[in-house]
A protein has these predicted regions:
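Tubulin/FtsZ superfamily GTPase core signature
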Residues: 1-303
């Protein structure tokens, strides 16, 4: 529970922010147990997630913890006010995390258009937890070629906006299928993975259908598409439940806040609003100058 009342934020981020600040010592106590990485998951657009998540993230990062934000932004049908509030929260969150994954619920609707509304919201929540679990499993599961905490930290530390996706392949060319499946995921938010600065990917297969040397050429071909300045980490993992399939998971960082869908318009709007505010301030100052001049004469302007 954040704050002393436990009554929710009433769609007011400032109330949730105050509650989080009130509970700061409890938050620090919870994090101060040898924690090396914290996932801050939230639904942006309401009060609690939008207001409290950035405060919790800021606290974790200041404690030296690798801090990863994983947030959703609203469906279009939830309205512009909630969307704008969500994008404000995303922008604030980006200032206080090492890496930020933004899941656009509207992209999920494109994939699961036949879902009921309740099931769609449930899928959004599942996607949050799946993303956190996938990152954690890269560290905790054993593989043929392992990736450890430091590998993940290298990619996520000061990584900016991140994107993550998983794809599957089966049969002839299954590795290429899995890679293409991941690269065409709506969760990538139309970002070009090859514009990332750091990338980590994992190929998972079943021992019942071993990964062949020829298939490694498909992995090499994918890796060769990245520029020489892009830092890449990769691993091979085993999952018996895949049977004859392979799974390809990719995590890329180094994108900017403008790469979040809808953020460009918010920032442009904010720039226009700021320009208008400055013009209004200038007009107000001019009005005051003229008023002083009316009462004290024009020389008052030179004093």
């Amino acid at each position: 529970q954040l704050g002393s009342e436990g009554l929710g934020a009433g769609n007011r981020p400032e109330r949730a922010k105050a509650a989080a600040e009130e509970s700061m010592e409890d938050i620090k106590l919870m994090l101060n147990d040898g924690c090396k990485m914290a996932f801050i998951t939230a639904g942006m657009g309401g009060g609690t997630g939008t207001g409290a998540a950035p405060i919790i993230a800021k606290t974790a990062k200041e404690m030296g913890i690798l801090t990863v934000g994983i947030v959703t932004i609203p469906f279009l049908f939830e309205g512009n006010r909630k969307i704008d509030q969500a994008l404000d929260g995303v922008e604030e969150m980006s200032n206080h995390v090492d890496a930020l994954l933004v899941i656009n619920n509207e992209r999920l609707r494109d994939v699961y258009s036949d879902f009921s509304v309740m099931k769609a919201f449930g899928k959004a929540d599942d996607t949050l937890s799946t993303a956190a679990k996938s990152i954690a499993e890269i560290i905790t599961l054993r593989g043929t070629i392992n990736l450890d905490f430091n590998d993940v930290k290298t990619v996520l530390k000061d990584g900016g906006v991140a994107i993550m996706s998983t794809g599957f392949g089966e049969g002839e060319g299954r590795v290429t299928q899995a890679i293409n499946d991941a690269l065409h995921s709506p969760l990538l938010n139309n970002n070009d993975i090859f514009n990332s600065k750091k990338v980590l990917f994992v190929i998972t297969y079943s021992p019942n259908s071993e990964l062949m040397m020829g298939e490694m050429d498909e992995i090499h071909e994918f890796m060769s598409k990245f520029g020489k300045d892009v830092e890449t980490k990769w691993g091979l993992y085993i999952d018996e439940s895949l049977e004859t399939k392979v799974k390809f998971t990719i995590l890329a960082t180094g994108f900017g806040i403008k790469d979040v869908p809808g953020m460009d318009s918010v920032l442009n709007k904010r720039t226009l609003e700021e320009q208008k505010r400055l013009e209004e301030m200038e007009e107000e100052e001019q009005r005051k100058d003229e008023r002083r001049s009316d009462f004290y004469g024009p020389n008052i302007l030179k004093n």
